[in-house]
């Protein structure tokens, strides 16, 4: 027993000697700041692991308190966070990270081995009291520069003191400044400071939308690829966010890196670190060009963007041959051609580049010479690189060389489309014949988009398409790829439709669509807002001009040379907080229209959903269509089916109008809404959906909140889109009324989808599509919507944009169904937005708020006038000519738009025709009675455009009234 105790004592003594020796060595080789970064308890807990380290051994890992620690040895030519060992930390949602490397070799491990200690904070640390009061921080700022920066006092209570106890006041102040710079943006701020003898300090501030920890590991990997040596690094959650809906005050992560490197590489390294914040690091471009060939990730983004763009076009040439994966593969197989293409692009748009433009001919010859021995493959490769060259030639301006950004934006000449038409005639058939006035293209990690407009001054909504968020991981990619193949056609067709419906206002038509691939984390709103903020900032940089017509950002070379004024409206997945944010950013940037860059602002605009302006117009066309069907909705029995749910803007507000009561009674007493089909649920009731129950949901809840106990008719049912689980079984819930009782059923996914889709086919007098994806009714399925056994309708009023394809419209009208096209039926939303923007330009914000109660009813009067005037013209003309209603909508739009162009050209030569009286006729009455002097606030381009569209409408509607109007005009003479 005594011998065993003696042996144990010897072991303990030997261990104590080892630990003490290790501690002394640690003191000798680690920088002093190491002992500030880690507590005494943490350092003591490290020592046993440090004694076990071996050269070329695997990293040792342990958990100490709330942190994960890793210890390993690095040879002089090794790297931190090495290889696959560090890869797993990219997915670890840590709130703090520290890397420390010894200044000298760690002697216990042998010669040439440096000790690396890493720690990752993975659970919240105990709250700590602030190290400095705000008064102390403010005094530092005052002593240094006169005053504390704006926003510092608001930021102070959000500082994450648990992570900041080691900072001195000067370091804290520096980080506060950088945090204030970027907490409302989707980009990183980077500062590199020389410390002498090729030593540098880099500070990085980055909004942590949902993946800040992975940004840290990407930066560390870029150090390795650049052959820079990290001595120590820190990553911490510097400040907490306000609620995630607050887009101006995000959580900000902060990184500090102390390293050695070559001074001449610093500018490129800074570009790379900034780009990595919003750049993919898991794709073929990163692996082949950044990792393998050491290309700067900022430069590689040009090729990524180009690949995304040409894929969006080749989708209408041959989707199978030109799938995205093959496009990317063929591009990276020819890095020399990629380098020449990038050089050509630089020669045109890099403001720091001197010398002549690079010629295209050598590049064209190199592309033509591609020859792998496989003819079909080579033909694809040549077309891909010719398409990339076409993309480059089409660029008129870009923010690519802007220092601080979170996305790329390109203004393109729409003539690029000719290239694809020459490859295949099928391409041209995919789009309306009219070609756009201008196209913008946007790109960043997991997001791409277009803005298409058909006139110089144009407006239209910004839609973000987020394919099937809640689906299985194995299917989510399929839905994304399907949307990816179609989204250029979607934005094109919607913009073209918008141009048709904008005939009553001075702006032509446009549309903006962003396609977003979500990470599947569940917090898709944060991903949505991060992408929208980045794309908006990139877009704004290309349309933000000084008073003299020069772009404000001097790093953008403008080969177009024309001031562009663009307006945006809200659309799918555009929430009030983002609308308000964009308005504020428009003011901060000094944009021509200020907050008028977007309409529908809840605090200083005419919010479409609040006032139901789009649905107001749809309802006017509904009433006129019912008259044509010889149905008096105020007394006759009739049935309705609707796509879109009670919480949606158009569907919800239309339900509000259809379900309204006067003196306690329904205005349409015998109306039956037999079917409603919405994303969260589908509802059918042959006796008519319970109107009181449906009314409870309108503009408050989605359709899945409908109480199944309120089902009425035999066979009535509701199905729910959210899948249910019991063990390994997944099913969909149905409640159906059978023999007077509600019965629960479990449906397979296929049965659910069959019922969901067929709910749109139910028999009703009138179909009101007010929500759903474009091309839902198409040439392949139109017969299911035509009249037949238990299905169909007598008329359609299109509240949703492009819900029917042109071919489907023709076939349905041939079958005898009346169809009021979207460009007529839902135009009142955009008319409202136009008046909102004009009112915002002419009134101060407080005036707008105070006059809103008067202004909105006057706008509604304008909406009623425009909707009724067109509806009467459509049905009157149809009764005479027999033309389809949709063709008449197109004819009217083309006539007014063509006349508008002619008048605009005339007004260029005769500006005296643009009178105040003409402008006031177009505007709500309050501007004639109270604010006539504000007309001078309108940009000259707007004055001419307003006069032009006002005259065009008068001329076309008057001339379209035929012989009766001609006689009336003759009698006046």
Model region roles, listed by residue range:
Residues 493, 623-641, 663-671, 685-699, ...:
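Non-transmembrane, aqueous-exposed alpha-helical and coiled segments at domain scale
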Residues 331-383, 390, 610-643, 647-725, ...:
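Extended, regular secondary-structure scaffolds
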Residues 2-437, 442-451, 464-484, 527, ...:
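Non-catalytic interaction/regulatory segments
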């Amino acid at each position: 027993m005594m011998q065993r105790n003696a042996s144990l004592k010897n072991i303990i003594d030997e261990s104590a000697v080892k630990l003490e020796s290790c501690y002394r060595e640690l003191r000798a080789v680690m920088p002093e700041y190491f002992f500030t970064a880690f507590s005494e308890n943490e350092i003591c807990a490290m020592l046993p692991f440090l004694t076990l380290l071996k050269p070329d051994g695997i990293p040792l890992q342990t958990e100490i308190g709330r942190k994960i620690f890793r210890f390993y040895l690095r040879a002089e030519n090794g790297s931190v966070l090495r290889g696959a060992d560090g890869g797993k930390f990219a997915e670890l949602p840590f709130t703090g990270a520290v890397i420390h490397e010894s200044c000298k070799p760690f002697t216990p491990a042998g010669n040439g081995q440096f000790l690396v200690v890493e720690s990752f904070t993975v659970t919240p640390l105990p709250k700590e009291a602030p190290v400095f009061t705000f008064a102390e921080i403010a005094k530092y700022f005052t002593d240094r520069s006169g005053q504390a920066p704006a926003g510092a006092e608001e930021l102070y209570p959000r500082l994450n003191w648990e992570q900041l106890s080691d900072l001195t006041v000067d370091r804290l102040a520096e980080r506060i400044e950088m945090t204030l710079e970027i907490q409302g943006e989707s980009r990183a701020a980077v500062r590199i400071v020389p410390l002498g003898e090729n030593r540098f300090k880099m500070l990085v501030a980055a909004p942590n939308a949902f993946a800040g920890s992975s940004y840290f590991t990407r930066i560390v990997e870029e150090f390795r690829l650049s052959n820079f040596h990290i001595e120590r690094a820190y990553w911490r959650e510097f400040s907490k966010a306000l609620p995630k809906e607050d887009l101006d005050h995000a959580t900000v992560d902060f990184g500090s890196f102390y390293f050695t490197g070559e001074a001449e590489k610093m500018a490129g390294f800074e570009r790379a670190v900034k780009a990595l914040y919003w750049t993919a690091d898991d794709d073929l471009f990163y692996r082949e060009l950044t990792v393998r060939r050491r290309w700067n990730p900022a430069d590689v983004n040009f090729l990524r963007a180009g690949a995304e763009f040409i894929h969006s076009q080749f989708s209408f040439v041959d989707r199978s041959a030109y799938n995205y994966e093959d496009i990317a593969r063929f591009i990276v197989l020819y890095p020399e051609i990629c380098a020449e293409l990038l050089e050509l692009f630089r020669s045109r748009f890099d403001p720091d580049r001197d010398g002549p433009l690079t010629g295209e001919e050598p590049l064209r010859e190199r592309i033509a010479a591609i020859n792998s021995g496989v003819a079909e493959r080579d033909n694809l490769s040549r077309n891909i690189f010719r398409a990339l060259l076409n993309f480059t030639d089409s660029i008129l301006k870009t923010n690519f060389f802007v220092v601080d950004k979170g996305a790329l934006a390109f203004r393109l000449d729409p003539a690029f489309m000719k290239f694809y038409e020459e490859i295949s005639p099928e391409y041209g058939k995919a789009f309306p014949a009219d070609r756009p006035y201008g196209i913008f293209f946007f790109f960043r990690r997991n997001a791409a988009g277009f803005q298409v407009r058909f006139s110089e001054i144009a407006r239209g909504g910004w839609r973000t398409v987020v394919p099937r968020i809640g689906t299985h991981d194995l299917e989510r990619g399929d839905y994304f790829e399907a949307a990816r193949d179609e989204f250029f056609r979607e934005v094109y067709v919607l913009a073209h439709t918008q141009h048709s419906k904008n005939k009553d206002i001075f702006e032509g038509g446009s549309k903006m669509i962003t396609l977003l691939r979500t990470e599947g984390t569940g917090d898709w709103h944060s991903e949505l807002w991060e992408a929208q903020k980045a794309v908006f900032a990139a877009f704004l940089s290309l349309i933000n001009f000084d008073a003299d017509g020069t772009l404000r950002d001097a790093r953008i070379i403008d080969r177009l040379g024309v001031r562009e004024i663009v307006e945006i409206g809200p659309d799918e997945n555009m929430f009030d907080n983002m609308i308000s944010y964009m308005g504020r950013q428009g003011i901060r940037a000094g944009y021509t229209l200020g907050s008028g860059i977007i309409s529908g602002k809840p605090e200083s605009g005419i919010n479409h959903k609040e006032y139901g302006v789009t649905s107001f117009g749809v309802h006017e066309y509904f009433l006129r269509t019912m008259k044509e069907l010889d149905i008096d909705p105020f007394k006759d029995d009739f049935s309705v089916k609707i796509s879109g749910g009670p919480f949606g803007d158009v569907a919800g507000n239309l339900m509000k109008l259809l379900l309204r009561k006067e003196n306690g009674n329904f205005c349409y007493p015998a109306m039956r809404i037999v079917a409603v089909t919405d994303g969260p649920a589908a509802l059918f009731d042959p006796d008519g959906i319970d109107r009181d129950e449906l009314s409870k949901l309108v503009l408050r809840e989605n359709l899945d909140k409908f109480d199944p106990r309120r089902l009425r008719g035999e066979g009535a049912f509701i199905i729910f889109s959210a899948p249910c689980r019991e063990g390994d079984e997944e099913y969909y819930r149905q409640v159906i009324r059978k023999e007077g009782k509600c019965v629960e059923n479990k449906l397979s996914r296929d049965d659910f989808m069959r019922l969901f889709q067929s709910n749109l086919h139910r028999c009703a007098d009138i179909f009101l599509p007010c929500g759903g994806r474009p091309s839902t009714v198409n040439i392949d399925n139109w017969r299911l919507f035509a009249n037949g056994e238990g299905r169909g309708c007598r008329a359609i009023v299109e509240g949703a944009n492009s819900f029917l394809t042109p071919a489907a419209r023709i076939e349905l009208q041939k079958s005898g169904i009346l169809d009021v096209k979207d460009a007529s039926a839902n135009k009142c939303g955009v008319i409202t937005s136009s008046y909102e923007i004009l009112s915002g330009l002419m009134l101060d914000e407080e005036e707008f708020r105070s006059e809103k109660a008067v202004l909105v009813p006057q706008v509604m009067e304008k909406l009623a006038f425009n909707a009724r005037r067109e509806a009467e013209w459509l049905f009157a003309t149809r009764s005479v000519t027999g033309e389809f209603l949709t063709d008449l909508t197109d004819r009217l739009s083309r006539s007014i738009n063509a006349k508008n162009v002619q008048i605009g050209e005339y007004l260029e030569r005769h500006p005296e025709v643009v009178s105040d009286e003409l402008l006031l006729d177009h505007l709500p009455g309050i501007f004639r009675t109270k604010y006539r002097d504000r007309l001078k606030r309108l940009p000259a381009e707007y004055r001419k455009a307003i006069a032009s569209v006002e005259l065009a409408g008068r001329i076309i509607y008057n001339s379209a009234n035929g012989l009766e109007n001609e006689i009336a005009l003759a009698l006046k003479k």
